[in-house]
Structures are given as structure tokens and as C-alpha cells.
Swiss-Prot record:
Descriptive protein name: Glutamate--tRNA ligase
HAMAP family to which the protein is assigned, alphabetical: Glu_tRNA_synth_type1
Annotated catalysed reactions: tRNA(Glu) + L-glutamate + ATP = L-glutamyl-tRNA(Glu) + AMP + diphosphate
The entry's keywords: Aminoacyl-tRNA synthetase, ATP-binding, Cell membrane, Cytoplasm, Ligase, Membrane, Nucleotide-binding, Protein biosynthesis, Transmembrane, Transmembrane helix
Length: 881
């Protein structure tokens, strides 16, 4: 006899993924055994069954490629067959009429619950007399028909998936209802178990393949097969499909119906392929991509798993991508056209066919689901695109604007564009504008796609050029006006959800011209500081010669700005000095000005300090004081604050001498750092000294400028400048004072330094010598390591003494948990373990408990163990130094 399997869904909802997986296994088994696959619609529940659900089930099975050989059969058309079978059971005395009301049954269940018994029917109406039946009918009660199930019955079958399965009659809940209530001698509507058995017998079903949640029904149905005299089929109960928490997948988990997966963009081939793997392992476990026909050739229930199968969305997406990447372009285009149309994209399936296939070729390698094409191809269906922030930043570059302008001059909107033309155009632009190829490519991507990432750039340009969209986007990206033009090829539907991407029928017209592009130098150095940043100007002092120095001060801030102008004073000559310093920062910068004082000769000292910071900025200007000659001093201080304030520095007073001394102090801190550049003092010779100090800080740094002082004698006076900080930073200046001679001993320099430090009320710091002190670092590390190793047992002992109670409690809890866990495993495996093996396991547990108590829990033994460790250490390492 040939194999006959069936799928029997109930039309109370759309085709569920679990029902579809059951259909796949039935179909595969039938094809493997050269049998028949029969479809039966179990619609006996007329209150919940709907025709639209029936249609959804049939359409879903056809969409998956699960064509049935016979059917569909409808149970609602087979009532007469069920009534005859039920009446035969009544005639044989295997079934009876039960007149219990719903209230009586509920009262019975509550009583059983109070006695902590499993709810079941107590068979109270199994042996009613005719007189009792007439009395119930006289009360107007209608009787259901129940099938007798004796408690002492044993039901056993060999399951194709689970092996031998045994049920007791006492576990089936008492006599089961097989027909709904009806008056008199009528037989009511059949219930599930009765209708299923009658249909399977009538259709000669040989194998019943369904989910494991039907195992209890199988025991009841086997009793009905025997009572009706039918041949019992073989049963196979497949594992359930679980959600990520390990529970049965249900409607509460969201996407569960086949129509939902279809809406999400999965192809039927990919979904059917994945459902094969939900509980079944192919002979070659590494071969995960196959058709239903290929799976049917290898299918067997020996490779169906017993454990539930978790639904893995990542695995499904991967399988879907494999199918889409290998699908021919024409077939994939046919599948994507309705998806584009549903998204509101205007296209001509016939006239645009060639262009659409080029688009499919471009996006196919990136597709995971069919619906991904909506977002991926959006930029190709509209004349213009909006630039994101990265693209806008790219197009603010002067080289980008020049590149796009050059492309507009070269490209011909009416001529076809080929790959060779694109490459030649890019080469010409790089030579003409003198920019790197990367700049041109980034500019093209930003203007054409509105983003800095996307599909292949050249292929995208070719597609956009065919629609005439490339010229429009080039012009818009650099701020040129776009004339109102009717778009013939593509227009935006009024109902499209993508209105923000641009109009469909009329090109956007930009009336606001784009800001002129900054020069390359400006784009590299002029960046506004962020919140809480202040730029610090640098003041310079001219020499006593006819020199004109122009400096500009520019401070740009985002939120908090502090601008302090610098007062400059010319020397005794006709000198004009304009001071302005530009400080430009990216995130947070602090520029520390250094004031320089010229000597009485042709000496020029230039000191520049560049400081880059990450977060905060403080600007501290420095004022300089000229010598005792014709001096004009103009000082103006303007302070603009938004959030924070900065204290103005202190200027020092020079005397009229030919010697200049510059004092600067550098203090470095771990978190809050204050960096002060160090100024050197030139002698009265023709010397030019250039000093630059660069300080990089991590969180918040403040650079404190130091004013220089000229003396009238060979004595130099050092003055420290104190700057108030924004957060918590202090600058401690330390000056070094050289004498007017060329030779000076180290002791004299140190003495001078100490004296200067005392005058400044600061700690002396030796900034003169660069001597290196050699330290035997390896020996120190070795000694430190040995000390740590020798003290480790003491540390452990102290830790144990401190937390002795907690550690003991934790140890006992862990021991109890491990013991009970182990004992549970042993008890569970008692059937398969010989008694001798159990004894050895118990001995092992007892020894483990004794060992822990003997060596780890008792204080005396623990101290003994520590003493032994100490002795071993002394023998190996000797006494610690």
C-alpha cells in the first residue's frame, strides 16, 4: 500500500508558520516515499471558521510550492459520515449520553482543585438508567456524547520521531466528548478527535505527521481507531517551533503567518528552505541551501530532532540573501517591480525594463529581502536628493566645488555616458583643478547620492545620467539654480511616502545662493571652537629698530567666548604696532601668549606657543611695558562672556637697561594641567633666539603667559603672573636668571634659582641642567615583585579574617548547590547506571566534602597549610630582602 499523508489545518486564522512547517514535512515525506499528499480543511468549528482564512491557507501553500495531490476536502460537508460512526459507538455501548450542565462540571472541577487533584470528568453519567435519562430530558437538558475510556487501559505506539510512547487511560481526563449537545436521540456536531479519526480511516491515511502538542490526542484517537475497527496509522510528532525565549511561537510574538513573511519580502523558496531546517538536519549538515525537491530526496524521520527548534531570524535572512544574490536578473526584476509600485515609485514596467534591470544588477549583491530594494533604489527614482551632514561637509570644501564645476563644463547632458567616459572625465578634472582623485570621487558621491556611502559610484552615475538626474544634482550640490522643468521619464506619485526626497513632476529651484567656499588654508585652520572654549591671543614686542609689525586677533567661539584684547607699547623709536592674533580651534584649544623683550642691540627674540586642547579653552592676553623713552600706550580690554569668565593677567614693570630676562614656568598636572612656556634671556650680543613651546593636554589645560622685564643694571628681577582659571587649574611660574657673564657654575645658577623662587613665593625647580639620574630600575622591580609575592599569603589571610563569615556562607551554599545538582543527575540516571557505579559516585561526593572541610574550612589546618607555603618559599627564594 502506498504512503498517504495529509495536512488538516483549521481555518480559524491565517496559515501559521508551524502549520506550514508541518505541511513541508508531510510533503517531503510523501515525495520521498512516492506517496500522496492530501489536503483537508477541518472547519467543524463553524463559529470561528472563516472563508477568508481558508483562502489564505490555500494561497499560502500554493505560494510555498506545496501542491497537494488530493483535496481540499471540507469536514463541514461530511457530517453524515461522522454521525453514522458516532451512532455505531452508541449502539456498541462504547459511547453514552451525558446530561451534565456547565455549572455541574465547574463545581466538579473546583472540588478536584480543592483536593489538589488533576481536573477530569468523573464519569458520573456513564451508567444512567432510562428513567434517569428521561428525567434529565424533562428538565430540558441536552446531552453530549462521551466515549468510554477505562482508567486501566494502556495505550502504546512507536512514534517515528520519539520512539516508544506509552499513555495510561487514567491520564486522559476521563470519558471524552466526541459530539456536541443535541436534543432527544439526535447526534450533535462532531468534535475534533472523532472527525479526525473518521476522516483518516475514510481517506486511508497511512502516516499522521503533526506537532508534538497532539501527543495526548493521539492516545485518545488510537482508542477510537480500535473502537471503530479501523487500521491505526503510524504517527510522527515533530518538534515545536520556539521563540527566542524557548516558548512555543505564537501570535503574541508578532510575525507568525506566512502572509506576514511574504509582506516582509521573503521569497517562497528561501522560506521553504528555512522551514526544512526547523527540526530536520540534512545528511550533509554543511549543505544548507537546497530546493524542496532536493530536500525530498534526502528526507527521513531518523534525522528529525526531538528538541524544539528556535526560530532564528538571522539564519532566515542569510538564506534569503543567498537566493536573491543567485536569482537571475530578469526574474528578480519581475519580483521587484510590484514592490516598487507598492512603494509609490512611478515606473513603466515595459518601457523602463532595460533601465530597471541595470538597477537590479547594481543593488542585487546588497539585498537580503526583496523589500530592501525600496530604500536602496530610492535615490534613482527622484530628480534630486537631500544631502546628509557628511555630504554637506564634503561639498563645503573648495576643491569639491571646483571639481563639480569642472564636471559640469565637461559632461554633455544629451550624450550617452559610458564607463570609459566617466573615467576619462574624472582624469580630466583632477588635471584641470589640480586635486587628488579621491576628492573628485567623494564630491561625486556626495552630490549624486546625498551620502558618503552607497552603491557603486560609476554605475550609479550611469543610471542617473540616463534619467537626466545627474546634471540637476550637480547644480543643486554647489548652489546653482535649477530651472523648473517637466520630468517626462519619472514623476513622483502623490501618495508616495517619500515626499521629503524631492518633488516628482517639477524640479526643485534653489533661490538662495550657496555661501562662497572657503579657501584651502581657511578650511584647514578656521574652525569654530565648541562649547566652553576660549581662544588666547599672543602678544609680541618689537625691537628698537624701525620695524612695523602687524598682528590680528580673531577669536571664534560657539557658545562661551572670552575675548581680551592685548595692549601693546612701542619702544623709543618711531614704531607702529598693530596687534591681532588669530586663534582657531577644532574642539578645544588654549593658546598661551609669551611676551618678549628686546635687548639694546639688534637682537630679536620670537617666542610662539601653540597649545592644542580637547575640551576647554582659556584666553589670557599679556601686556608688555616699554622702556623709559617716548612711549605711547593704548590699552583696551573687551570681555564678552556667555557662560564662563577669565581673569586678566598682570604685567610687570621694566627698567632701562640693556639686558633682558624672560621668565616662564611650566607646571604639568595629571588631570588639570597648566602649561607655561619657558622664556630664555639673551645677552647683549648680536643673537637671535627663537623659542617655541607646544603643549598638548587631555582634558582641560590653561597656559599662563609670563611678562618679561628689562633691568637697568646687571640684576634681573623675576615676576610671576597668576592667572585665575575657569575650572581648577593654577600656574606656578619659576624663572631662571642668567648673569651677564659667559661662564657660571652650577652652584651659582641653583642659588640664583632658589633666590628667585623665594622672591616669587614658589618652590625652586632646577630648570638649568638636563642631567640624567640613572636608576637601577630592573633591580627595583625585581625586589618589589619578591616583596609582593612574600606578602601575598598574609594578604589572603587578612582578607579571609575580614570576610570570614561571608566566605564560609558562600562556600557552604556553593557546596550544597553542587551536591544537590549532582545528586539530581545521579537520581535521574539511576535506570542506566549499575548499583556499583552509584556507590563509587557517592564515595566521590563524600570524599569531596571531607577534603573541603579538612583543608579549606578549619582554621588550624588552613594555618598549617600557610606555614608550609612559607617554608617552601624560604627554601626557593630565601628570606625577603
Amino acid at each position: 500500500m502506498s504512503v498517504r499523508v495529509r495536512l488538516a489545518p483549521s481555518p480559524t486564522g491565517n496559515l501559521h508558520i508551524g502549520t506550514a512547517r508541518t505541511a513541508v514535512f508531510n510533503w517531503l515525506f510523501a515525495r520521498n516515499q512516492k506517496g500522496k499528499f492530501i489536503l483537508r480543511i477541518e472547519d467543524t468549528d463553524q463559529e470561528r471558521s472563516r472563508p477568508e482564512y481558508t483562502d489564505n491557507i490555500l494561497e499560502g501553500l500554493s505560494w510555498l510550492g506545496l501542491e497537494w495531490d488530493e483535496g481540499p476536502f471540507y469536514q463541514c460537508q461530511r457530517y453524515e459520515l461522522y454521525q453514522k460512526a458516532t451512532q455505531s459507538l452508541l449502539d456498541k455501548g462504547l459511547a453514552y449520553r451525558c446530561y451534565c450542565t456547565a455549572a455541574e462540571l465547574e463545581e466538579m472541577r473546583e472540588a478536584q482543585k480543592a483536593r489538589k487533584e488533576a481536573p477530569r470528568y468523573d464519569n458520573r453519567h456513564r451508567n444512567l438508567t432510562d428513567l434517569e435519562k428521561k428525567a434529565f430530558e424533562a428538565e430540558g437538558r441536552q446531552a453530549v456524547i462521551r466515549f468510554r475510556i477505562d482508567d486501566d487501559q494502556i495505550i502504546t505506539w512507536n512514534d517515528m520521531v520519539r520512539g516508544k510512547v506509552t499513555w495510561k487511560g487514567s491520564d486522559l481526563g476521563g470519558d471524552m466528548v466526541i459530539s456536541r449537545a443535541a436534543g432527544g436521540d439526535e447526534v450533535g456536531q462532531p468534535l475534533y478527535n472523532m472527525a479526525v479519526v473518521v476522516d483518516d480511516m475514510d481517506m486511508e491515511i497511512t502516516h499522521v505527521i503533526r506537532g508534538e502538542d497532539h501527543i495526548a490526542n493521539t492516545a485518545k484517537q488510537i482508542l477510537l481507531y480500535e473502537a471503530l475497527g479501523g487500521k491505526i496509522p503510524e504517527f510522527g510528532h515533530t518538534p515545536l517551533i520556539l521563540n527566542k525565549e524557548g516558548r512555543k511561537l505564537s501570535k503574541r510574538d508578532g510575525v507568525t503567518s506566512i502572509s506576514d513573511f511574504q509582506e516582509l519580502g521573503f521569497t517562497p523558496e528561501a522560506l521553504a528552505n528555512y522551514m526544512c531546517l526547523l527540526g530536520w538536519t540534512p545528511p550533509d549538515a554543511t549543505e544548507e541551501i537546497f530546493t524542496l525537491a532536493q530536500a525530498g530526496q534526502n528526507f527521513s524521520f531518523e534525522r528529525v530532532n526531538k528538541a524544539g527548534a528556535k526560530f532564528d531570524w538571522d539564519k532566515l535572512d542569510w538564506i534569503s540573501s543567498q537566493y536573491l544574490h543567485n536569482l537571475p536578473v530578469k526574474q528578480l526584476t519581475d519580483k521587484l517591480i510590484p514592490i516598487w509600485q507598492k512603494a509609490g515609485y512611478e515606473l513603466d514596467p515595459e518601457g523602463d525594463r532595460s533601465w530597471l534591470e541595470q538597477l537590479v544588477t547594481l543593488i542585487r549583491p546588497s539585498l537580503t529581502r526583496l523589500t530592501d530594494a525600496v530604500e536602496m533604489s530610492e535615490l534613482f527614482f527622484f530628480p534630486t536628493v537631500e544631502l546628509n551632514e557628511d555630504a554637506k561637509t564634503q561639498m563645503q570644501n573648495e576643491d569639491s566645488v571646483k571639481s563639480i564645476n569642472s564636471i559640469l563644463e565637461i559632461i554633455n547632458a544629451d550624450a550617452p555616458l559610458l564607463v570609459a567616459d566617466v573615467k576619462q572625465t574624472i582624469k580630466k578634472v583632477t588635471q584641470k583643478v589640480h586635486v587628488k582623485k579621491g576628492v573628485v570621487m567623494r564630491s561625486l558621491r556626495a552630490s549624486l547620492t546625498g551620502a558618503m556611502q552607497g552603491p557603486d559610484l560609476i554605475e550609479s552615475w550611469l543610471l542617473l545620467h540616463q534619467k537626466g538626474f545627474d546634471i540637476l544634482r550637480f547644480k543643486k550640490s554647489i548652489g546653482q539654480e535649477i530651472e523648473d522643468t517637466k520630468i517626462e521619464d519619472t514623476k513622483k506619485a502623490e501618495t508616495t511616502p517619500h515626499k521629503s526626497k524631492g518633488e516628482g513632476n517639477v524640479l526643485l529651484k534653489t533661490t538662495t545662493p550657496k555661501s562662497p567656499a572657503l579657501s584651502k588654508e581657511q578650511t584647514q585652520t578656521t574652525k569654530p571652537p565648541k562649547k566652553g572654549q576660549t581662544a588666547t591671543p599672543v602678544a609680541t614686542t618689537p625691537t628698537a629698530t624701525d620695524v612695523t609689525e602687524n598682528t590680528s586677533v580673531g577669536t571664534q567661539e560657539t557658545q562661551s567666548q572670552i575675548t581680551t584684547p592685548v595692549a601693546t607699547t612701542p619702544t623709543a623709536t618711531d614704531v607702529t604696532e598693530n596687534t591681532s592674533v588669530g586663534t582657531q580651534e577644532t574642539q578645544s584649544q588654549i593658546t598661551t601668549p609669551v611676551a618678549t623683550t628686546p635687548t639694546a642691540t639688534d637682537v630679536t627674540e620670537n617666542t610662539s606657543v601653540e597649545t592644542q586642547e580637547t575640551q576647554s579653552q582659556i584666553t589670557t592676553p599679556v601686556a608688555t611695558t616699554p622702556t623709559a623713552t617716548d612711549v605711547t600706550e593704548n590699552t583696551s580690554v573687551e570681555t564678552q562672556e556667555t557662560q564662563s569668565q577669565i581673569t586678566t593677567p598682570v604685567a610687570t614693570t621694566p627698567t632701562a637697561t640693556d639686558v633682558t630676562e624672560n621668565t616662564s614656568v611650566g607646571t604639568q598636572e595629571t588631570q588639570s594641567q597648566i602649561t607655561t612656556p619657558v622664556a630664555t634671556t639673551p645677552t647683549a650680543t648680536d643673537v637671535t633666539e627663537n623659542t617655541s613651546v607646544e603643549t598638548q593636554e587631555t582634558q582641560s589645560q590653561i597656559t599662563t603667559p609670563v611678562a618679561t622685564t628689562s633691568t637697568a643694571t646687571d640684576v634681573t628681577e623675576n615676576t610671576s603672573v597668576e592667572t585665575q582659571e575657569t575650572q581648577s587649574q593654577i600656574t606656578t611660574p619659576v624663572a631662571t636668571t642668567p648673569t651677564a657673564t659667559d661662564a657660571e657654575t652650577r652652584e651659582q645658577k641653583v642659588a640664583t634659582q632658589v633666590e628667585t623662587s623665594i622672591l616669587d613665593d614658589q618652590k625652586p625647580v632646577d630648570t638649568v641642567t638636563n642631567q640624567t639620574v640613572e636608576v637601577e630600575q630592573p633591580n627595583k622591580i625585581k625586589e618589589q615583585f619578591i616583596n609582593i609575592f612574600f606578602n601575598f599569603p598574609d594578604y589572603i589571610n587578612q582578607l579571609y579574617q575580614q570576610y570570614q563569615g561571608q566566605l564560609k556562607l558562600f562556600g557552604w551554599l556553593a557546596l550544597v548547590i553542587l551536591t544537590f545538582t549532582f545528586m539530581a543527575v545521579v537520581i535521574e540516571a539511576l535506570d542506566g547506571i549499575p548499583i556499583l557505579s552509584i556507590i563509587f559516585e557517592l564515595i566521590g561526593v563524600i570524599y569531596l566534602v571531607w577534603f573541603v572541610y579538612r583543608y579549606l574550612l578549619k582554621r588550624s589546618n588552613r594555618q598549617e597549610l600557610l606555614d608550609k607555603i612559607e617554608n617552601i618559599k624560604r627554601e626557593i627564594f630565601g628570606k625577603p630582602s
